[in-house]
Swiss-Prot record:
Disulfide bonds join 23-26. Its main location: cytoplasm. Belongs to the glutaredoxin family. CPYC subfamily. GO terms for molecular function: glutathione disulfide oxidoreductase activity. This is Glutaredoxin. One of its GO terms (cellular component) is cytoplasm. InterPro entries: GLR_AS (IPR011767), Glutaredoxin (IPR002109), Glutaredoxin_euk/vir (IPR011899), Glutaredoxin_subgr (IPR014025), Thioredoxin-like_sf (IPR036249). The keyword Ligase does not apply. SUPFAM superfamilies: Thioredoxin-like (SSF52833). Has a glutathione-disulfide oxidoreductase activity in the presence of NADPH and glutathione reductase. Reduces low molecular weight disulfides and proteins.
């Protein structure tokens, strides 16, 4: 059930961040996404009744047990390091735009 819930969240949102409210790496990723103007769904596993089950299901699905666990355009990205590395390389914004998390603008 928890895996189905996780997959439903991932498929229903351009960006999904499985997070914990007290995790500084999670806060960093959510802050970065917000600064970039991305629309994302944050699932705070420590606030969810079945959060530990969802986290275990994510580990089974992605091989990553740690948070944040980031998905963009239904693709598993990884955690904070992977997300910030994509940003440093100039690859995060195009991924977010392609996924529909950022509105395309005509301004340069």
């Amino acid at each position: 059930m928890s895996l189905a819930k996780a997959k439903e969240i991932v498929s229903g949102n351009p960006v999904a961040v499985f997070s914990k409210t007290y995790c500084p790496f999670c806060v960093s990723v959510k802050d970065l996404l917000s600064k970039l103007g991305a629309t994302f769904k944050a699932v705070e596993l420590d606030s969810e009744k079945d959060g530990s089950e969802i986290q275990a299901a994510l580990a089974e699905w992605t091989g990553q047990r740690t948070v944040p666990n980031v998905f963009i355009g239904r693709k598993h990205i990884g955690g904070c390091d992977a997300t910030t590395a994509l940003h440093r390389e100039g690859k995060l914004l195009p991924l977010l735009t392609e996924a529909g998390a950022i509105a395309k603008t005509s301004t340069a």
